[in-house]
Amino acid sequence: MEIQEISKLAIEALEDIKGKDIIELDTSKLTSLFQRMIVATGDSNRQVKALANSVQVKLKEAGVDIVGSEGHESGEWVLVDAGDVVVHVMLPAVRDYYDIEALWGGQKPSFAVGAAKPWSAV
């Protein structure tokens, strides 16, 4: 399965569970570890876990190997590693605090650019 197809499936899985502020970054020129990074936000720990689980289930059904997954215990930041595609699902405050989009050359989604945020990073 091609990387674009895997990314599309992961994004669909996030949208199915109402993931917010979903972005996809092409990291192929930045690292050889993975080709795409997808970042999404969930409103609660429970939703973050459900979003990550949805990604895992949808990718497994399509025959994609899941290398690993971390963060299900707390549900604040869950990572799903599907080899060439890595998915990060976070609570809003965690996403704002770590700003991994900027670390990988992306832009913060519109909710963080000049918009009033309903949270603040500690």
Swiss-Prot record:
Cytoplasm found in the keyword field: yes
Q: Which UniProt keywords apply?
A: Cytoplasm, Repressor, Translation regulation
GO terms for biological process, alphabetical: cytosolic ribosome assembly; negative regulation of ribosome biogenesis; negative regulation of translation
Give its localization.
Cytoplasm
Q: Which SUPFAM superfamilies match?
A: Nucleotidyltransferase
Query: Which GO molecular function, any one, fits this protein according to its record?
Result: ribosomal large subunit binding
Q: Which domain of life is it from?
A: Bacteria
Show the InterPro entries listed in the entry: Iojap/RsfS/C7orf30, NT_sf
Has the keyword Aminoacyl-tRNA synthetase been applied to this entry? no
* Cellular component annotations (GO), alphabetically ordered: cytoplasm
NCBIfam families per the record? rsfS_iojap_ybeB
Quaternary organization: Interacts with ribosomal protein uL14 (rplN).
Family in the record: Belongs to the Iojap/RsfS family.
**Protein's job:** Functions as a ribosomal silencing factor. Interacts with ribosomal protein uL14 (rplN), blocking formation of intersubunit bridge B8. Prevents association of the 30S and 50S ribosomal subunits and the formation of functional ribosomes, thus repressing translation.
Tell me what this protein is called.
Answer: Ribosomal silencing factor RsfS
**In the record, what lineage is assigned to the organism producing the protein?**
Bacteria, Pseudomonadati, Pseudomonadota, Betaproteobacteria, Neisseriales
